[in-house]
C-alpha cells in the first residue's frame, strides 16, 4: 500500500479517487492505481479472453457449405461428403459452444472412413482441414507399435500435428489428424494369443486415450520417450481424429451376417458377384468391425462410420478433368507456361481411366499413368519452336503414335515456302 504524504494527498491516476476513498492504492514510477481500477481492468481482460475463446476456429461453415467446398475437390462420394459435413460441423460446434458444467455433455465423435484404395479418404480429410483452416497431420498406422517396442509411439502422431501448427499448442488442440491404414492394426485373430500383438491390438489400446481425450506428453524431437527428457503437453479432447482404411475382406463378414438373417422359406440368396460392393458396405455394423479385428473400446471411440464407394470409370474421368486442381488442369498450366495449349481428347481420358481400374489403384494411380504418358511429350515440347497446340490422343496413351501438334501460322507459312521451293 502506498504511504500517506501529509503535504500531498495521493490519487489514483485512472479514476482520480483519493487514497482515503479506496481500500488499496498501488504505487508505480510516478503513477498510482486503486483496487477498484485493478478489478475493472481484470474484468475487461477476462471478457476479451472469453470472446477470443468463443471465436474458436472463426465462423463455422454450415454442413451445406462444407459439402459444397468438398464438391470442388472431391468427385462422387455424395453420401460420404454429406455425413462428413454433418460430423465435422457438430464437432467444431461442440468446441465453440460454452456449455455449463451442469448442462448436457456433448461427447466427442471421431470418424472412421471405410473404402477401397484410391477412393478419396485422405483427400476428404485434407480438404476439410483446408476449409476450416486448422492444422492437419497424416499418420500411417502401420508404423506404430505399442510403447517399449521397435517402431513409433502413438504420441508421435501428435508431434506431427504440433509441427503443422508451428508449435502453437492452442492451435494444434483444434486440429485434425488423419490416421491412414487403420485396418492394418486389426487384431491378428479373434482369440487372444499368448504372444503379444504389438503392432495390432497393442496399438489400438495405445490409441484409446488420445482418441477419447487426454493430456498427452509428446517428445519434442519425436522418437521414444525416456524419463530424463522434457515433454510438450497437449490436450487431445478437441482434436478430431479421422481414421481411414480399405478393410479388405470385411464385405464377406457383412454378407455372412446379412445372409444368415435373410435365409428362410423362399428367401432369395444372391451371390457376392451379383451384389454391389458399395451396397454391402453400407450395411456395416460395429459387430462386423469387431469380427474383422478391431477391439470394442476402439470401435466405441470412433462412433461415426462413413463408407466410400469404389470409383467407376466415369468418376475417374471426372476426377481427371473437373476438380479445381484436376491433374489435366495442372498439365495444361505447365504447358501454358511454355506458350503451348494442351488438350486431351475424350477417348484418351477414357483409356487412362481404364488403365487405373485395371491396376486397381483408384484415383491415386492416375498421376503415375499420366506421368508415363507425358514424359516424352514434356521432354520434346520445350525445345520445339512455334508449337501452338498439343493434343493427347488415344494412340498417344497406347504409345502407338506421338501427340498431334498444331503449329503457329508463321511455322505453317515457313513449311509452305519450303514446299514451293522444292517443287520449282
Swiss-Prot record:
SUPFAM superfamilies: Glucocorticoid receptor-like (DNA-binding domain), P-loop containing nucleoside triphosphate hydrolases. InterPro entries: AAA+_ATPase, ATP-dep_Clp_protease_ClpX, ATPase_AAA_core, Clp_ATPase_C, Clp_protease_ATP-bd_su_ClpX, ClpX_bact, P-loop_NTPase, Znf_CppX_C4. Zn(2+) binds at residues 12, 15, 34, 37. GO terms for biological process: cell division; proteolysis involved in protein catabolic process. Residues 1-53 form the ClpX-type ZB domain. Component of the ClpX-ClpP complex. Forms a hexameric ring that, in the presence of ATP, binds to fourteen ClpP subunits assembled into a disk-like structure with a central cavity, resembling the structure of eukaryotic proteasomes. This is ATP-dependent Clp protease ATP-binding subunit ClpX.
Amino acid at each position: 500500500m502506498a504511504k500517506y504524504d501529509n503535504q500531498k494527498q495521493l490519487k489514483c491516476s485512472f479514476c482520480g479517487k483519493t487514497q482515503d476513498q479506496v481500500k488499496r492504492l498501488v504505487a508505480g514510477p510516478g503513477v498510482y492505481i486503486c483496487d477498484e481500477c485493478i478489478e475493472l481492468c481484470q474484468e475487461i481482460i477476462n471478457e476479451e479472453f472469453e470472446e477470443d475463446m468463443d471465436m474458436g476456429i472463426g465462423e463455422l461453415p454450415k454442413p451445406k457449405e462444407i459439402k459444397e467446398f468438398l464438391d470442388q475437390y472431391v468427385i462422387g462420394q455424395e453420401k460420404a461428403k454429406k455425413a462428413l459435413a454433418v460430423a465435422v460441423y457438430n464437432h467444431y460446434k461442440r468446441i465453440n459452444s460454452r456449455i455449463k458444467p451442469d448442462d448436457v455433455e456433448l461427447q466427442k465423435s471421431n470418424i472412421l472412413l471405410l473404402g477401397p484404395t484410391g477412393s478419396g479418404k485422405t483427400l476428404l480429410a485434407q480438404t476439410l482441414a483446408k476449409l476450416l483452416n486448422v492444422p492437419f497431420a497424416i499418420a500411417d498406422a502401420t508404423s506404430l507399435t505399442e510403447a517399449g517396442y521397435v517402431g513409433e509411439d502413438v504420441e508421435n502422431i501428435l508431434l506431427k500435428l504440433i509441427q503443422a501448427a508451428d508449435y502453437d499448442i492452442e492451435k494444434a488442440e483444434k486440429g485434425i489428424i488423419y490416421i491412414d491404414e487403420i485396418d492394418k492394426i486389426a487384431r491378428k485373430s479373434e482369440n487372444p494369443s499368448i504372444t503379444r500383438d504389438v503392432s495390432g491390438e497393442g496399438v489400438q489400446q495405445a490409441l484409446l486415450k488420445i482418441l477419447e481425450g487426454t493430456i498427452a506428453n509428446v517428445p519434442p524431437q519425436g522418437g521414444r520417450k525416456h524419463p530424463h527428457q522434457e515433454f510438450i503437453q497437449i490436450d487431445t479432447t478437441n482434436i478430431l481424429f479421422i481414421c481411414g482404411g480399405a478393410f479388405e475382406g470385411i464385405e464377406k463378414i457383412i454378407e455372412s451376417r446379412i445372409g444368415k438373417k435373410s435365409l428362410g422359406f423362399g428367401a432369395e440368396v444372391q451371390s457376392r458377384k451379383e451384389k454391389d460392393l458399395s451396397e454391402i458396405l453400407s450395411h456395416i455394423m460395429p459387430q462386423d468391425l469387431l469380427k474383422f479385428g478391431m477391439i470394442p473400446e476402439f470401435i466405441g471411440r470412433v462412433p461415426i462410420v462413413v463408407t466410400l464407394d469404389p470409383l467407376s470409370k466415369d468418376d475417374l474421368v471426372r476426377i481427371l478433368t473437373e476438380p479445381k486442381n484436376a491433374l489435366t488442369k495442372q498439365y495444361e498450366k505447365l504447358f501454358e507456361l511454355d506458350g503451348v495449349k494442351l488438350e486431351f481428347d475424350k477417348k484418351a481420358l477414357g483409356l487412362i481411366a481404364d488403365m487405373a481400374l485395371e491396376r486397381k489403384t483408384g484415383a491415386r494411380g492416375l498421376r503415375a499413368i499420366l506421368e508415363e504418358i507425358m514424359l516424352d511429350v514434356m521432354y520434346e515440347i520445350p525445345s520445339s519452336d512455334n508449337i501452338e497446340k498439343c493434343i493427347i490422343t488415344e494412340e498417344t496413351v497406347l504409345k502407338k503414335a506421338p501427340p498431334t501438334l498444331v503449329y503457329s501460322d508463321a511455322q505453317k507459312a515457313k513449311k509452305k515456302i519450303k514446299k514451293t521451293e522444292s517443287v520449282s
